Amino acid sequence: MKLILTAEVEHLGAAGDTVEVKDGYGRNYLLPRGLAIVASRGAERQAEEIRRARESKVIRDIEHANELKTALEGLGDVTLSVNAAGDTGKLFGSVTAADVVNAIKKAGGPNLDKRTVQLAKAHIKSVGTHPVTVKLHTGVEAKVSLNVVAQ
């Protein structure tokens, strides 16, 4: 069955792509959920419009991501003060991605989604300087240095 995707489907394609799928997958999953339409001449023209709109949106998103990257890398070291720390420098909890986002915002950085923050480890559990990667878009990442200090 030949279909045109109307939304991004994992492991299949992006909106506007023409794909060949098994009949059952198309009829029972993609079409009822509105993720695809049956390929026809009129639908192919519509798919071309979807592709053009997606390309212009991707260009805008990449430009915005580069602006955010410049703003983040201009911050320098971001300091996060933690109350619960022991004498040995270990935290009585952990620093999560949400804590990092709040620290960046307090340092004058942009407002980010916590899902964009990637920590070197799952959670930071000690004081000191830790590298943090912020994935802003496909291929656009900003490196931020997070300094965790005990109060």
Swiss-Prot record:
Keywords: Ribonucleoprotein, Ribosomal protein, RNA-binding, rRNA-binding. GO terms for cellular component: ribonucleoprotein complex; ribosome. The keyword Manganese does not apply. One of its GO terms (biological process) is translation. It comes from the Bacteria. GO terms for molecular function: rRNA binding; structural constituent of ribosome. Pfam families: Ribosomal_L9_C, Ribosomal_L9_N. InterPro entries: Ribosomal_bL9 (IPR000244), Ribosomal_bL9/RNase_H1_N (IPR009027), Ribosomal_bL9_bac/chp (IPR020594), Ribosomal_bL9_C (IPR020069), Ribosomal_bL9_C_sf (IPR036791), Ribosomal_bL9_N (IPR020070), Ribosomal_bL9_N_sf (IPR036935). Binds 2-aminothiazole antibiotics, which are antitubercular agents. NCBIfam families: L9. Binds to the 23S rRNA. Belongs to the bacterial ribosomal protein bL9 family. This is Large ribosomal subunit protein bL9. The gene is rplI.
